[in-house]
């Protein structure tokens, strides 16, 4: 079998490491060696003590200050929110009161305007009725005059028509007085 020189060297290094490992195999890893347990425990206690002092003296006060500041800020914000709520409640109450007053005033104004309009309409209606009544009376007078005039003309027309009819039908001349008395007796 053919072996390269690089492979041969790596085998030599491996053999050397195995020999060195067997020399150290009898030794224990120092943190797990119970002979040194006391010193390990001592340094553990000192490390945790220093860590505890650091946390209790530096970190916890800072966290406490942050919590206190936050609590004060929340309390301040809650107080401010309460004041703003009270202000908003008073503003809403004032708004509702003024709105109710405005509505009642608007109702009074609307009623007054309605009454005023009713009075104006009633006055105009009376004026129009009076005007129409006057025009109706004037028209009745004119109709009566026209009717009387027409009736007067009807009488004279009836007289002339009766004279003509009698003359044509009977071929007799009748006096105007007799025809007039006959037309009056007929109601014309």
Curated annotation (Swiss-Prot):
Coiled-coil residues: none
UniProt keyword Cell inner membrane, yes or no: yes
Compartments where found: Cell inner membrane
InterPro entries: ATP_synth_b/b'su_bac/chlpt (IPR002146), ATP_synthase_B_chain (IPR050059)
Keywords: ATP synthesis, Cell inner membrane, Cell membrane, CF(0), Hydrogen ion transport, Ion transport, Membrane, Transmembrane, Transmembrane helix, Transport
Domain of life: Bacteria
CDD domains cross-referenced by the UniProt entry: ATP-synt_Fo_b (cd06503)
Protein name per its UniProtKB record: ATP synthase subunit b 1
Organism of origin: Bartonella quintana (strain Toulouse)
Gene it is expressed from: atpF1
């Amino acid at each position: 079998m053919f072996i390269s020189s690089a492979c041969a060297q790596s085998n030599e290094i491996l053999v050397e490491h195995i020999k060195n490992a067997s020399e150290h195999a009898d030794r224990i890893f120092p943190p797990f060696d119970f002979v040194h347990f006391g010193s390990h425990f001592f340094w553990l206690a000192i490390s945790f003590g220093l860590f505890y002092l650091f946390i209790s003296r530096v970190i916890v006060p800072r966290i406490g200050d942050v919590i206190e500041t936050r609590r004060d800020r929340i309390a301040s914000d809650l107080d401010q929110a309460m004041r703003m709520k009270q202000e908003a409640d008073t503003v809403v109450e004032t708004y509702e009161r003024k709105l109710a007053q405005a509505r009642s005033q608007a109702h009074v104004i609307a009623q007054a305007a309605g009454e005023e309009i009713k009075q104006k309409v009633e006055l105009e209606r009376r004026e129009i009725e009076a005007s129409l009544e006057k025009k109706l009376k004037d028209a009745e007078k004119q109709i009566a005059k026209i009717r009387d005039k027409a009736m007067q003309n009807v009488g004279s027309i009836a007289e002339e028509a009766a004279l003509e009819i009698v003359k044509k039908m009977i071929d007799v001349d009748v006096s105007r007085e007799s025809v007039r008395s006959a037309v009056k007796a007929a109601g014309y």
